[in-house]
Amino acid sequence: MDYIDLLALHKINNLRLHLTDDEAWRLEIKSHPELAEVGGFRGGDSPIWPRYGKWNERWGGYYTQDDMREIIAYAAVRNIEVIPEIDLPGHSLCMATMHPEILCNYEPNKSRAFGYDTRSAFCPAKEANYELLDDILKEVCELFPTSYIHIGGDEVDMSQWRRCPDCQAFMRKNGMANESELQRYFMSRLTEILAKYGKQPAVWNEAIEGGKLANDTRVY
């Protein structure tokens, strides 16, 4: 809450919360509790490997939905809008630890990563991925009163899509010239999900390299 007070002091009226990344998942999703209950911790017996810090002890944490409602209310009194970011389609290594089915269909080279699977991006060719993300984004949209939900779009390792036979077949079928167009398709599907729940997308600028998204997209 101290950070929110500092934002108010400096008349900054937006707080973007980066709630997911390769390293952790920090928001409770009731339809998929494993995301935070497992993905919010690392070390010890956790399947999430620590990048820094303790290896022998389990540590971490996440925001419950009640926690987040308290933060949103505290910020609103100070005229600050809280915008959540669910970073997609890349930066999903943590989520893939619990849901490996989201990944592209090829055998990763683990020898360069000490046995650790470094695939970190959703496979845009898998229809089931959009069903999973619909579950997640529905709860995010219901929880946050903001008009905008940030859906990421940055730093996607597209070499994974180039190696994926499903992605390549999907691109050929749909006349896509490159993987940036495949990312545009993925982000457009998420935009449709958000629109269904009355929200607009915010993205990083890399998300529009494959072409224009919806007119109401906020680009950072």
Describe each model-derived feature in a short phrase.
Residues 2-22:
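Catalytic domains of carbohydrate-active enzymes, especially glycoside hydrolases
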Residues 7, 82, 133, 151, ...:
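Conserved, mostly hydrophobic/aromatic
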Residues 23-77, 92-131, 159-180, 184:
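Aromatic- and acidic-residue-enriched carbohydrate-binding clefts of CAZyme catalytic domains
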Residues 154, 158, 165-220:
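Catalytic-core regions of glycoside hydrolase
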Residues 4, 68-72, 86, 133-141, ...:
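Generic structural signal for well-ordered alpha-helices
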Residues 20-24, 87-91, 154-156, 206-208:
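Active-site beta-loop-alpha junctions enriched in small/polar residues
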Residues 11-13, 76-80, 145-149, 195-200, ...:
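Short, well-ordered coil/turn segments that N-cap beta-strands
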Residues 87-88, 107, 114, 118, ...:
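Active-site groove signature of glycoside hydrolases
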